[in-house]
Amino acid sequence: MVNQPTKKTEVFLSLGSNIDPEKNLKYACRELKKAFGNIQISSVYRNKPIGFEGNDFLNMVVKVKSSFNPNEMLDFLGRLESATGRNVGTGAFDSRSLDIDMLLYGNLVHQEKPFQVPRIDIELYSFVICPLAEIEPDGIHPISGKTFKDLWESFNQEEHPLNKVSLKV
């Protein structure tokens, strides 16, 4: 009997940190490479925190191809966050050693707990849509049907300004 290759799904992840961000983003990318092999990485962007006072965040988007189902992916990402000292009990608007959100899981549309894809953050925050449009400009949002490039170009970029930073991860 021949083993069938496991089908892999394209998964897009948003990574952010404002506590030792250079170290934590490098750690996350290293672990993602170990787990998934070849990954695609956006530029890194600096932005002010939204909804609270704190250090600037560094944010990026990473594309992986995974045989994990969505729940397995969430468990894996939670372990990466915990390894950097992230306290999962912190509020939505708080400093973070590492925050990894699953933005897209293939073309899956799932809007119930424990996860939502596509994640609404794609259309709300420049630090999500800008790097996503950078690495997948012609990708199609599974609900709106718009390309990520079009979503970024129509985004109010003055409301959430970003600065690209030079960081090798």
Question: Where are the regions a protein language model picked out?
Answer:
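Short N-terminal secondary-structure initiator segments
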Residues: 1-6, 67-77
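Short, surface-exposed acidic-centric catalytic microdomains
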Residues: 27-73
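Short beta-strand-to-loop capping motifs
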Residues: 15-17, 62-68, 104-107
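Flexible, gly/pro- and Lys/Arg-enriched active-site loops
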Residues: 47-57, 71-74, 79-169
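N-terminal beta1-alpha1 ligand-phosphate binding loop
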Residues: 2-35, 42-48
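Amphipathic, positively biased hydrophobic alpha-helical segments used for protein targeting
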Residues: 25-27, 62, 117, 156
